[in-house]
Amino acid sequence: MIRISQDLGAGSSSCRVDPGGIAEAGSRLRASLEDKPDLVVVNKFGGLEKSGGGLADELLWAMAEGLPVLTAVSGRLVDEWLEFSGGHCDLLRPDEAALWQWWGSQRLYQDLLLGVADGPIARITRSAHWLLIEGPDACGLARIPRGADQAGRSLEDFAAQGLRQLASLVNSIDLFEAALGLAALNAHYNRPGLEVGGGNGLDAFAEEEGRVVAIGSFPDIARRLPNALVVDAQPDAHEYPAAAADWLLPGCAAAVITASTLANRSLPRLLDLARGSRVALAGPGTPLTPRLFSYGVEILAGFIVDDPAGMAQCIAEGATPRGFRQFGRQVTLRRPG
């Protein structure tokens, strides 16, 4: 810890800035910026920075590099801050909800990756529609997105990468690789010993009186959520096309979103559209981790594999999620409060 102020003695409520401390803090901060941190936090934008001193150069450097910068600005210095930053900033309320909204739902992928421990991959199994990855502690499932190119993809080569490296493929623009990355994430998070409840994700909002939107044509949805407005990439006569999410999600009472949106990278945008509404992320490919609660998800309805060998055979034979149930269980994880 570097002190940048000096006490003026007993009985004084003031302090003065220590030039040596400022210089050392600036040097340390510049060195840290070279490593491209996820977030730069500077205690405050004060009188020194307003005049071009203090940590002004480091703040400008971080912003010029495109790094997210968070600092406190007093009301009397707001105009000076806007001039200093050139207006390229967001003024936030000092509360957690505003901070998470500023942070952005697109960062949830990196957040999920930060929690993954490395380890060997025992097996990868695929069918035309599903992937199963068996890691050191659990199995993870993911649906392969429509349009994913599986031709000539060696599962052995992917398995040799290890769990953490394979999970990083969730950031890939290649749909098959992104699905592998999601399955690897789930092979870390969806562990048999996890403290979770039971239940089907479609039941989460069965009693909701307002508009309920389902992103994805879930099996059995007509019975479990008969009044839901269903949005699907390939809608039938009673469903809406994908573009309808733009006007159906804002202001809805609740939304059930398929976990497949993680692999096709549409989830962040859908969460932004549904901001302020109750949201459940549902499907066998749902990562069961509280990390997703901060991004607006209230309920995680996923799947835990209890019989890896049986599930691998089930996937290899091309079974649907209905057939998964004899080798694992549907579970829910709810945001506290």
What name fits each language-model region?
Residues 86-92, 225-246, 277-278, 295-302:
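Active-site regions of enzymes building and remodeling cell-envelope glycoconjugates
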Residues 60-65, 224-225, 247-250, 271-276:
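Short, conserved loop/helix-junction motifs that constitute active-site signature segments
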Residues 58-75:
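Substrate-engagement module of ASCE P-loop NTPases
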Residues 1, 10-28, 37, 45, ...:
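Conserved mixed alpha/beta catalytic, RNA-binding, or beta-rich assembly cores of soluble enzyme
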Residues 100-219, 315-317, 330-337:
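Electropositive, gly/pro-rich neighborhoods at or near active sites that engage anionic ligands
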Residues 84-101, 280-337:
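C-terminal functional extensions of proteins
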